[in-house]
Amino acid sequence: MAEYKLELKGVCKSFPGVKALDNVQLSLRPGTVHALMGENGAGKSTFIKVITGVHKAEEGEMYLFGEKVDFKGPKDAQEAGIAAVYQHPTSYPHLTVAENIFMGHEKKKGFFLDDKAHSEGAKKILQRLEHEIPPETMVGDLRVGQQQMVEIARNLNQDDLRVLIMDEPTSSLSAAEVKVLFKIMRELLEAGISIVYICLLYTSPSPRDTERS
């Protein structure tokens, strides 16, 4: 078995006039959390998008369980078990909470979507997050913190989750929601899931919640 779950070696990515990533190295062991801290414009978002297949690196290599991977797009990364919670919710406001949570992981009953299974599954995940949001609620009607919890729930609904990247996930959460989030993070680590926790220098999580930075 490979020592590292995810590795980046010499990754570079540039945009016109800007070198966003310069020889980035990352070694992520199973069941560990790494804090990636930096100011705005330091390349944190580009880093996420390279790992999740949104951007393609110009140089360097990425390995998953010791095998080289070359994601052609976000779907490839998702199928490999890599998920991301972004700073600003990317949920669909015109869809319900349940529809958002099961987006890309829809359950079917015959030729039709199984709305009952979606509703029950959404309730179960939201209870784990200590949120009693009705699954039929439109996401656009929720406050920003609740939308972020729906985003987290959608990623937790990924059965083959291996690596979770969290981009300033607490920025729109209440103190109580942050406490729940850190509890969930510890549960994920115990299950062997690896986490990359991205934050600004002055909003870094407690040292006890991260193992490397």
What are these language model-derived features?
Residues L164-E168:
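Catalytic Walker B motif of ABC-type/P-loop ATPase nucleotide-binding domains
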Residues G60-F71, D76-A80:
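Conserved ABC transporter NBD signature motif
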Residues A2, D70-K75, K107-R128, E132-E136, ...:
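Short coil-to-helix "N-cap" segments within the ABC nucleotide-binding domain's helical subdomain
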Residues M37-E39:
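The feature captures the beta-strand-to-loop junction immediately N-terminal to the Walker
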Residues T52:
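Helix-to-loop junction immediately C-terminal to a conserved catalytic motif
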Residues Y202, P207-S213:
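Single conserved hydrophobic/aromatic residue that forms the stacking wall/gate
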